[in-house]
Each structure stands twice: as C-alpha cells, then as structure tokens.
Amino acid sequence: MSEPLKPRIDFAEPLKEESTSTFKAQQTFSEVESRTFSPAAIDEYPEDEGTAEAAVDAALQPKRSLWRKMVLGGLALFGASVVGQGIQWTMNAWQTQDWAALGGCAAGALIIGAGVGSVITEWRRLWRLRQRAHERDEARELLHSHSVGKGRAYCEKLAQQAGIDQSHPALQRWYAAIHETQNDREIVGLYAHLVQPVLDAQARREVSRFAAESTLMIAVSPLALVDMAFIAWRNLRLINRIAALYGIELGYYSRLRLFRLVLLNIAFAGASELVREVGMDWMSQDLAARLSTRAAQGIGAGLLTARLGIKTMELCRPLPWFDDDKPRLGDFRRQLIGQLKETLQKNKPTPEK
C-alpha cells in the first residue's frame, strides 16, 4: 500500500535572490598619480615561519640586570689592576736587575696572553655560531626576492665556509646551471637543490650511525649509569660532527650554547611533533609485544639521538628547509627497528639438533 502524500508547507518569507558579484567602478589615474603609484605590500612570509626560532632566540637573550653590570665592571677593573701591577713589577725588576722576578713577570705575561687569546678565540667561535642564524635569515630573504646580484656571492660564501672545493661535481653542476638572467631567488634555489644536499646527506649518515649505536648500546647494556654516560658522550660528539660538516667550528662556550639551543628548540617544538611523526605508526606495529623491554628502551634512546641530530642540522644549516628535503623522524625509526631486529636475530642462539 502506497504511503499518503505529505501536506503542503507554505513559507512566510520569500525566496532569497541570488547575490551577484558587483565590480567596482573604473578608476583612472592621472600621469602624476601613476608615477607615484606603489602596489600594496603583500606578506610573503607565513605567520608561523620562524616562530620557534624567534622564541628560542628570545629565551637565550641574557637579561641585563644591575648585578650583571656590577660583576662585569668589577672584572674589568680587576683586569686593569693586574695589568698595571704587572707592568710596575716588570719595571722594578728591570731597574733592580732582579732576573728571577723578571722571569716570573714574563711567565705571568705569557699565561695572561694565552688566556686572552683563548677568550678571543671562544668569542669568535660563539659569534660565528650566532652569525649562522643571520645567514639563514638572509637566505630566507633571498628566496623571496626578485633582485639580482647577491645570490651568487652568498652561495659561494656558503660553499667556502663548508669547505666545498671548486672542482666538486655538485658545485660544478651549479655553476653550469646558473646564468646572468636569473635572479637571486633562482640562484639560491639551485644551490639548495644541487649543492646543499651533499652536506645534508653526510649529516643524515652521521645521525643514522650515532642513533644506531645508541640503540644497540642501550639494548645490550645491563648498566643504566653506563648507558647515560654513553648517550651523553655520543650526543655531544654528534653535535660536533654536524657543526663541523656545516662549516662551524665549536669552542667550549659555543658548544654549550648550541647544545642549549638544540634542547630549547626541541622543548619549543613540543611532544606533538613526535606523536605526529612516530606515535600512530609505533602503536600500529605493536612493538611492545614484539620486542623486549631493553630493546624498546634502545629504540627510544636512538630516536632521541636522531631527534637531537635533526634539530642540530636545522640550527647549523645555512639554508631553511624545503618541504621535501627536511628529514623525518619516522625514516630513522624504520631503520633503527630493522637494524635492531637484525642484531637480535644474529645473537639469538640456534637450537641444537
């Protein structure tokens, strides 16, 4: 039996007419206005670009307090007093022909000179590390610029800092690909796709090797204290290796600053990135049911080392990452799991016949 028809529904309001797009009236500029016309500025940079790095730089800026100024002033006054007293002792020893005191003054002068030289060297290396962030900002500006004349000199400076020889095949391909009609954006883009991947590949191999060593060491070592010392030592060596690959020579204070910068960068990135890259795939494979507790701890330590290496690459790299060349933590995870399974299968005793 067919269903009864529904009653008619009357709407009180009339149907809305379709809105048609209206165009603005034509506007004619005079000759004087056309000369002074300037297009509206368009924000070429995304809002979130460089937010984490800016937050890290702000966190690392020392707070200028009164106590800090007093301590620096006291140290400067003490240094001037030591130099003045040393000059007076030297003059007195020379006038009285006290050769023992004169030798002591000479030894003290050598020690002070060595200390001042070390301070200058450390300051220069620390300045070089800070300069890398400015170079990355300059590269970001060139990649959004249509000017001509700065890109080639900038890329040649990067190649010289990284120790890339002029006869290197990648650099030769870059020279063959550029010409005078290209702007700075195209020249820097070609360098980023032809020359920079050579250094990135070496850094990736270092990160993969150190992460694998950390994974295997934690998986087979029964001592937690030894594990902690080993991981700390290997992570510091990884930071030194990556910085050297990108042409940055680290001193004591610059090494501490870079290590602190990496840790702060990881902290600002948060755990959401780790969950997004690894979490779902980790849970889908049910590793807790397949591997032992020590093996799972080894994979976790290896992933932390890999994450430390990725952030070090990001901070030491002179060019910003493109979407397709940034290393992913999931790539290292799959490699670590494969190497760990292979090692466990080799060490597994075969049943006797």
From Swiss-Prot:
Annotated Pfam families: DUF697 (PF05128)
Predominant location category: membrane
Cellular component terms (Gene Ontology): plasma membrane
Cross-referenced InterPro entries: DUF697, UPF0283
Disulfide bonds: none
Keywords assigned: Cell inner membrane, Cell membrane, Membrane, Transmembrane, Transmembrane helix
Compartments, record wording: Cell inner membrane
TM region positions: 70-90, 100-120, 213-233
Residue segments, region Disordered: 1-29
Biased composition annotated in UniProt, kind: Basic and acidic residues: 1-19
Regions of compositional bias (Polar residues) in chain numbering: 20-29
Topology relative to the membrane: Multi-pass membrane protein
Membership in a protein family: Belongs to the UPF0283 family.
Protein name: UPF0283 membrane protein YcjF
